[in-house]
Amino acid sequence: MKNFKYILLTTIFTFIGISCEQEMTELSPFPSEGYSSPSGSSGSANFAKFATIGGSYTAGMMDGALHNFGQGHSVAKLIANQLAYAGGASTFYQPDINSANGYIGPGPDGIPGTSDDQGRTYLTQSASTGAIGIDFAPGDLMSVLTPYGGDKTALNNFAFPNSVLAMYLTPFAGGPNVPANPAYNPFFARFDASGATVSPLGQFIGSGASFFMTWLGHSDFLGYAARGGDQAQVPIPDAATLGGYFQSALGGMLAANPVWKGVVGTVPDLLAAPYFQFIAATVAKPTEIIPMANDATLAQLQGLAAGFNALNTSLAGLGYITAQEAGMRTLSWSVGANSILVEDETLTDLGPLWDALVGLGLLDAGTRAALDPFKMARQAFDGEILPLSAQVVIGVPVHPSMPTAVYGVTVPLPDQYFLTGAELYEFEVARQTYNAAVAGAVAAYGGGRVAIADFNGYFESLAGTSPFTNNNVVVTYDFAPPTGMWSTDGIHPNARGYALVANKFIAAINDKFGASVPSAMVGSYTGAALPVTVN
């Protein structure tokens, strides 16, 4: 994979000052784009009515939230725009969110619906220092809680974010909103036309469409990886279960409507998104991160490492841990960049062993206390992943009164901020297994009516060719303005990126059905927005 890892947020934007003269002093409406006016044909397909179902990409989530601009440039909407040139309808109804900023969650007060609620993210640039940052626009909780005001029975796009595949198969996705109903999704409930009696998939099937796009399972994998593989928050996707769900969904769709045709998508190589590639595993600089740090601090860390490593060697010699694990846990600090200290739940918990050594008089209590943060710790290996969310934790003291106890250096990052090599392997096996189930379902039930847009390796291929041009416009695989194809959350594309994704689906449609649907003109869509100037 092309190396597009970056250490600090400022690194990716060093060119802003020389390539972008524009300054923004407040949040402004996004510009509109012009669309091409080509012509095409539908081949053996019928695009008269197009319906879609899927997760956050299909719904148009962008900058961490579902908002007007993102929804207006969803993958579903951009495909519909192009189908209109090949016999498709000129209208495509989505459950308008009616919010410029959308809603991510409560702000620092932790209370939803208050003045510090957080909406979409955007880039900022300090007027005094030029430093680049990311901030939140004011959140709009009511955009999620307010029912869609249009005709719910006329919708074309049944996609909704913050979902898992099982939600699409149950009417309980529409309610009730009670703790005993984990299937409830407020983004679906606001446009549920059935009063929680028909599943999202059932309503999608009942739309009477002649052509469909289905992208299911994507969000299950995205949610797990985004939370660092912390199974206490999101379990690793069970590929066998998800594959069964998809087979049931596709079989039901095709049986219920024996004439419609469509396209399905596989789960992309999500770990190639900037959210998972932005922070290098070797960013810890103790003498810069720890306040008042100096050569003496580094010497203390090196002394701690020497003692820790020697202790592990002894434990391996006594058979309490393997020599391989002792090697994995070797700590090393030096001047400059060092590997991040992380928590690895697969390691042996050394706490009880150290307690036993204290009881035997072989380890003093002070040393035991100093070692406690390292009982399941090691330093990250090359190729392991720190999600972008770790940026706000690395180098932060555990408590203000403990300035030298900082995450990533002297205290391991919690599991939610790190994907181990084992977790990455499990993730990829599950993703590939699920994608094989998608292909198997199409082979078993498709009957020549279903195309597959295979996104395996797609993001990595874009990263490997970045920068590239479209319509004489430069496109880069990042969220750096003005050329980037990713939104500021690093995990959802922006309008330009969604156009690239839409074109992948369009290519599959053309290939399967002998159609000539024109591709979206990627260069005509907005890339990453310029930063807002702040004091």
Model-derived segments and their meaning:
Residues 205-207, 245-264, 430-454:
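A structural motif corresponding to the C-terminal end of an alpha-helix
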Residues 56-59, 217-223, 268-272, 457-460, ...:
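Solvent-exposed loop/turn segments at secondary-structure junctions
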Residues 48-64:
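Catalytic nucleophile-elbow at a beta strand-turn-alpha helix junction centered on a G-D-S/GDSL motif
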Residues 66-248, 271, 276, 282, ...:
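Conserved SGNH/GDSL esterase-like catalytic core that processes O-acyl groups on lipids
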